[in-house]
């Protein structure tokens, strides 16, 4: 065997071994396009929210479990809130034709609470609500419409400090049925809206204190026993 052959033989063997041990080309990624329709079908097959059945009748709001919370921005630093308690109101609900439903609510300003006595006094002063002259705020619906499953849109007249303006509430029905404690037909709602203080003559210190206020309402109401 020549010297050249002796030198090339180990190289040839190494090349052969390398070729045998080289892994097969990586398999092409699986086609995932078929999974997309399957996922979409699964999403469409998700159960829909069941409609809550609210009994027709005249409901009385429960002030213990009714809260009207308002929130604003203070000089860009904080988002304080206040709430109206001792709310009095009546809801007439027509299950056959929700557009025939109505609601009337009275908010006594004596129930206004910003969690600080001095601030409560300021809010009730002539700078804001002037509660001595205007002791209550009221809301009276003018239109009730279905807005999807367990959703309503309630439009009405809000009167604050002698000024009346139209307001629209986005309402969610939380639940309905016999109240486990009261044993009465009952219903619970949440509602939200956004107002401008200046529309009702309580726009003091705007815009440092935001003119817009967010309103969140939660309530329970029951049909009283017949007397």
Q: What do these predicted ranges mean?
A:
Residues 1-18:
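Sec-dependent bacterial lipoprotein signal peptides
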Residues 20-227:
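Low-complexity, acidic/polar, glycine-enriched regions of mature
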